[in-house]
Amino acid sequence: MSLGLVGRKVGMTRIFTEEGDSQPVTVLDVSNNRVTQIKTPATDGYSAVQVTFGKRRAIRVNKPSAGHFAKAAVEAGEILREFRVAEEILGTLSPGTVIGLDIFQPGQRVDVTGTSIGKGYAGAIKRHGFASNRASHGNSRSHNVPGSIGMAQDPGRVFPGKRMTGHLGNVRRTIQNLEILRIDAERGLLIIKGAIPGSKGGDVTVSPSIRSARPTNNGNVNAAAKGGAKSGKKGG
């Protein structure tokens, strides 16, 4: 339940640390994020902030969306995303408020959501990482087939969830716990370590990582428990 930003994937490059190490990074354009709607428990049943990114010509906006943007007195955008937030935050925001990159800091961990690149219809080897069969030595027709997909008359069917051939990619995916290396507030760019789903120009959503907020177990409790178990054993 934290406020985030929406934007577009610019592409990948690399940067060098002070020690001279090369790190692959993804550049995200999250400039000009503005609030289009505030949702409260009284009116909508939950608290959330709706944000838009980019610009779209009025002729390219359908009537329902045009009315929605006009009601908020906000220039029409290309993307609309909603962030669930605590009710206390709603008082600091209003339609038209610009959300800057100052909600993030270098070194902070974030979750990035995007749409993976579509690969079309793919076989089980590419889709699920299956191993291929022998290239020769008696194998003449089953090099890349998935193999058996079930049993005999009993149960006489293929179990649900069986990994088979099918469409690969073009689905929403979230990569968690990525690190922000640099922030270019002047140009509205986030430099994030590693890769994220999608091709250049794809829509992305960036929000504070939910994993970094969880309590971690450093192993001290387990170590103490093991020590107690050993000390409780009877001597030989």
Curated annotation (Swiss-Prot):
GO cellular component: cytosolic large ribosomal subunit
NCBIfam families hit by this protein: L3_bact (TIGR03625)
Gene3D superfamilies, alphabetized: 3.30.160.810, Translation factors
Species this chain originates from: Nitrosospira multiformis (strain ATCC 25196 / NCIMB 11849 / C 71)
Subunit structure: Part of the 50S ribosomal subunit. Forms a cluster with proteins L14 and L19.
Name the record gives this protein: Large ribosomal subunit protein uL3
GO BP annotation list: translation
Pfam families associated with the record: Ribosomal_L3
Assigned keywords, A-Z: Methylation, Ribonucleoprotein, Ribosomal protein, RNA-binding, rRNA-binding
Compositionally biased spans, kind Low complexity: 217-228
